Curated annotation (Swiss-Prot):
A matching Pfam family: DUF3605
GO biological process: N-acetylglucosamine metabolic process
Protein known as: Uncharacterized protein YPL067C
InterPro entries named among the record's database cross-references: DUF3605
Organism whose genome encodes this protein: Saccharomyces cerevisiae (strain ATCC 204508 / S288c)
Amino acid sequence: MQQDIVNDHQEEAQGWKWEQIKEIIESGELARLKRSRQMTDKYHEHKKRTAGLDMNQYVLQKLGWSLDEPQLENAAAKAFSSSTLYAVRANDFPYNFEPGVVHLVLWSKVALPVHSPDKAVREAARARMNAFLQAQPLLRPLLSSGHVAWFVNYPELQSVARIFHAHVLLFFPRERYSAEQVKTTVDDILSHGFEPLA
């Protein structure tokens, strides 16, 4: 089940710093990335309001997708090849990060085996994801500054386990970006989506 609150009071008050976030992702200690107590409460309230509808079905309805669609052959190599295969959304219940970190979720009908025990398979899946993000014009300024990161939670940490999704984090340092610039960039991403990967 998805991890909930953070335990350390300092982390709770400040949220994870960008460099800490990248270190945690690199280390693979993804269970350390959690929601704040306030956001966790909102998440549980949401689950109560949608009682009887599991989170997988809830997300499918929001995306207008079905799990009954045919599976692609050589799926990982075709991930993100068409805009009909994925969708990017703001995380309704973001993790506890410092101000300036925008938490998006990239939903995909094609599951990338980023945690495969087979190293070659795992590396190919990660390379596909990296190539997809690097191909996005709206992300280029952030990518060039090292201000884009992503991760896929381990299955035991996922609250929506039946639909592949990656957490995409964008960092807008407050000394370089105004609130209006951040809003404009994020609104552009959410309204236009990401471009498919050839």
